[in-house]
């Protein structure tokens, strides 16, 4: 066991490990240490100041799920854009579950929207489930507000995948887009631009959203594919 692993096990909550394992199917139960996210997030902020941090970011693959979660949190704190992209692309092939994928949210991306959009297009076309999911999630996080362009909707709309965690992210994206950019997005639902399962899941998520008006929800119900 490495020194870092010893430090991680010192934060272990075995009941939480069992809980995480149930939420993350496909990941071996024995790979969960069981560190609560707020605790791990606090540790990550301190660990970024340590010399061992850089070594850890190059030691792939990791043995434990919690190490991968830590890796994602550390990438989120990297301040140099080019370095962040390099570390992200080195790590993505090793991401094997939705939780690690979704914990990554690099703060530096917000300052580099122009360059980032090209990366998002590449990631979203990936055949690797979680690289594709990360690309769509990053688009959703950064390009549905003041930086929105209608053409960005084509990126997730063009994704063709039978992978559950990709389809769910496309649905999540379009439900969020309906909430934030209704006029530009509704035609994708009206014209059945999405696969039937994704189409209906988008409508379901949008109807569950407090950001969609009652009138919009009523209209969306008429657009379900039966």
Could you tell me what each predicted segment is?
Residues 1-226:
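Alpha-helical scaffold domains
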